[in-house]
């Protein structure tokens, strides 16, 4: 255990917390072509590849994903939530953080109902998470 005098001379270092969605913590100045330290809650990007992947054991499915080039020129893999989607290559999408536990390397979600991504059709409950408008009564 250090003495008070030792702590005065050299204080304790606080732990550095690693980000769970690092691509959202980097901005980009396109005029100067340099990355910046601007963080953002969401980022816009262009889908470069849309496909399916299989989850880790013990799960079994075909999970929909998109490879997205963000506005800060970083390319990431993002999950497409909900049943059915209208995304294809060159679709403009909005990304948020949030990993998918059974897909290794997928740390981002695509926001449904924003930009080129349509909301989930015929959804009655939990509509706000899937970008679905209120149905006509």
UniProtKB/Swiss-Prot annotation:
Superkingdom assignment: Bacteria
Disordered, as annotated region: 1-57
A biological process term (GO) from this entry: translation
UniProt GO molecular function: rRNA binding; structural constituent of ribosome; tRNA binding
A GO CC annotation given for this chain: small ribosomal subunit
The keyword Cell membrane is annotated on this UniProt entry: no
Keywords: Methylation, Ribonucleoprotein, Ribosomal protein, RNA-binding, rRNA-binding, tRNA-binding
Gene3D superfamilies given in the database record: Nucleic acid-binding proteins
3-methylthioaspartic acid found at: 102
The protein's assembly and partners: Part of the 30S ribosomal subunit. Contacts proteins S8 and S17. May interact with IF1 in the 30S initiation complex.
Protein family per UniProt: Belongs to the universal ribosomal protein uS12 family.
Job description of the protein: With S4 and S5 plays an important role in translational accuracy. Interacts with and stabilizes bases of the 16S rRNA that are involved in tRNA selection in the A site and with the mRNA backbone. Located at the interface of the 30S and 50S subunits, it traverses the body of the 30S subunit contacting proteins on the other side and probably holding the rRNA structure together. The combined cluster of proteins S8, S12 and S17 appears to hold together the shoulder and platform of the 30S subunit.
UniProt protein name: Small ribosomal subunit protein uS12
Organism: Streptococcus gordonii (strain Challis / ATCC 35105 / BCRC 15272 / CH1 / DL1 / V288)
Gene name in the database record: rpsL
